[in-house]
């Protein structure tokens, strides 16, 4: 391991973290600096093939345009989600949304768990592509929660289901290298990933309450949190191990919500007045359906189109992905916003004004998203080899602790790329080779990678910026990341311990 090379490859990440967390600068300020530094490295230190300036421009130019195009797609999703929130505010329906949720439970802590964890799990299975945080964060803000806390909670809620993604893509496609090599089946990859994340969802309700309310938030709520964690844990285990990756996330989210509502109605929760949402008694302007209509439409249309369109149209999924997977999700959210506006009786003039106001708030995000994505693509590129250098150096140092390192490598990949799928595809072959040389189980090692990649989404700057933009918190990324890093550290250690136990003690011969 060449320590200088490692530090130089790591330096773009350091620039982002130190700028946002250390100097408390906005991502809008830090991201262009990180991009400039990464470009300098690509043209000089990591010009591995000794290309001329013109040749390097030719290699990097497609990566720059790819970053801009993918950034536009993310901004489009942010625009759709933020427009819905602004419509609810403009019409006053936001108060009726609070009242509707309060009818399920007037305990704000229960609302945090259902909307912050269970809804994102469902949405990840229904669509993925950043939709969970983009929908859950504005929803929590609509319920009256602090915006930065809402963002952190929504990102945390999506920290486990991202291993399965829309219809299991992250595990199915991400683990294809193991399947193609005859080392694992899709079912085995899904089962082992579920055995990691079942413990993640077990502890997340407790972390969320501490994040939102501090220690006082646990008063009278521990029985419910235990039920929510255990029921979600068991549901995820059963679906991932005995049903399949395709339905694990959506099924876990839906069943957990139903079980949670049943618990609240049949058993009840002791709610101190300070945690009670009084919105249930206010004078309504809209019915529950009308007030919630944009979100109701999304909950119906996202899974309906994701699973229904490929089922009835030949090559339907390929058609959906013509402009990239995320684009169809963008369109559905935009359509749901329009349908919601019609349901709420919003006239065209008002809708246009809301869209204009929303656009002025989210368009500057393109600079941030584009810059960070270009940094990610350059670091992933074979022309620089920066990401592979980081991963291989970590692997070379840890030796028999490689299973734990695989979790960290997965997280670092998702931190840079913004997707668990990208991280899995990037490092799967490296884990296969490492497992062979160490005489370890490649399935459990890849599961650690897969689980870590899902968790890495929690602290990814791209995801944080996008989620901040949905609730008008651009510039407050440091406040959000301080919250998410604490949660990330707890679950990362848990997953690293599980990786060692699964590989070396409990399942050394799983699938072999």
Spell out what each predicted region is:
Residues 1-6, 24-30, 60-72, 187-195, ...:
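Interfacial loop-to-helix junctions that mark the boundaries of transmembrane helices
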Residues 8-17, 25-47, 75-81, 225, ...:
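Hydrophobic mid-bilayer segments of alpha-helices in multi-pass membrane transport proteins
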Residues 24, 163-277, 451-512:
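Juxtamembrane and boundary regions of transmembrane helices in multi-pass small-molecule transporters
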Residues 58-92, 114-121, 287-308, 321-385, ...:
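Core transmembrane alpha-helical segments of multi-pass membrane transporters/permeases
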Residues 69-74, 101-115, 143-149, 326-329, ...:
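Membrane-interfacial loop-to-helix junctions in multi-pass transporters
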Residues 107-138, 142, 366-382, 397-430:
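Hydrophobic alpha-helical transmembrane segments of multi-pass integral membrane proteins
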Residues 109-121, 147-163, 184-205, 400-415, ...:
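Alpha-helical transmembrane segments of multi-pass membrane proteins
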Residues 131-141, 154-155, 168-180, 208, ...:
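Re-entrant/interfacial helical elements at transmembrane boundaries that shape
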């Amino acid at each position: 391991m060449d320590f200088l090379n490692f530090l130089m490859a790591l330096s773009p990440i350091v620039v982002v973290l130190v700028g946002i967390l250390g100097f408390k600068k906005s991502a809008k300020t830090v991201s262009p600096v990180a991009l400039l530094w990464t470009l300098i490295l690509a043209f000089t230190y990591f010009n591995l093939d000794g290309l001329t300036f013109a040749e390097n421009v030719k290699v990097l130019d497609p990566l720059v345009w790819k970053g801009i195009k993918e950034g536009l797609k993310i901004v489009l999703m942010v625009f759709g989600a933020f427009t819905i929130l602004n419509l609810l505010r403009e019409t006053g329906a936001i108060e009726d949304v609070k009242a509707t949720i309060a009818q399920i439970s007037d305990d704000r802590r229960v609302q945090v768990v259902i909307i912050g964890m269970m809804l994102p799990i469902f949405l990840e299975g229904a669509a993925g592509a950043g939709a969970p945080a983009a929908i859950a964060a504005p929803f929590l803000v609509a319920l009256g929660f602090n915006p930065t806390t809402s963002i952190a909670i929504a990102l945390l809620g999506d920290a486990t289901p991202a291993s399965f993604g829309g219809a299991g893509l992250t595990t199915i496609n991400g683990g294809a290298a193991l399947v193609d090599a005859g080392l694992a089946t899709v079912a085995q990859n899904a089962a082992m990933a579920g055995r990691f994340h079942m413990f993640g969802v077990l502890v997340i309700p407790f972390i969320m309450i501490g994040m939102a309310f501090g220690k006082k938030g646990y008063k009278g709520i521990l029985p419910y949190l235990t039920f929510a964690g255990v029921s979600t844990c068991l549901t995820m285990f059963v679906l991932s191990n005995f049903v399949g990756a395709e339905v694990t996330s959506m099924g876990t989210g839906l069943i957990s919500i139903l079980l949670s509502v049943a618990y609240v109605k049949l058993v009840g929760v002791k709610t101190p007045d300070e945690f009670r949402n009084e919105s249930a008694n206010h004078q309504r302007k809209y019915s529950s359906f009308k007030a919630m209509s944009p979100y109701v439409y999304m909950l119906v249309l996202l899974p309906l189109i994701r699973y229904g369109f490929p089922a009835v149209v030949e090559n339907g999924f390929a058609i959906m992905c013509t402009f990239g997977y995320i684009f169809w999700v963008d369109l559905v959210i935009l359509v749901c916003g329009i349908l919601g506006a019609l349901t709420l009786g919003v006239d065209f003039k008002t809708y246009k004004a809301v869209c204009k106001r929303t656009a002025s708030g989210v368009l500057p995000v393109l600079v941030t998203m584009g810059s960070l994505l270009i940094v990610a693509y350059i670091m992933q590129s074979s022309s620089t080899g920066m990401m592979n250098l980081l991963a291989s150096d970590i692997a070379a140092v840890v030796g028999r602790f490689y299973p734990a390192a695989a979790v960290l490598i997965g997280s670092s990949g998702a931190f840079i790329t913004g997707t668990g799928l990208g991280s899995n595809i990037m490092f799967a072959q490296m884990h296969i080779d490492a497992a062979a040389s160490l005489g370890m189980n490649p399935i459990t090692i890849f599961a650690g990678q897969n689980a870590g990649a899902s968790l890495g989404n929690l602290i990814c700057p791209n995801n944080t910026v996008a989620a901040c933009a949905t609730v008008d918190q651009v510039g407050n990324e440091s406040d959000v990341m301080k919250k998410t890093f604490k949660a990330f550290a707890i679950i990362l250690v848990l997953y690293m311990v599980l990786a060692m136990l699964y590989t070396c003690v409990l399942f050394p011969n799983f699938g072999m």
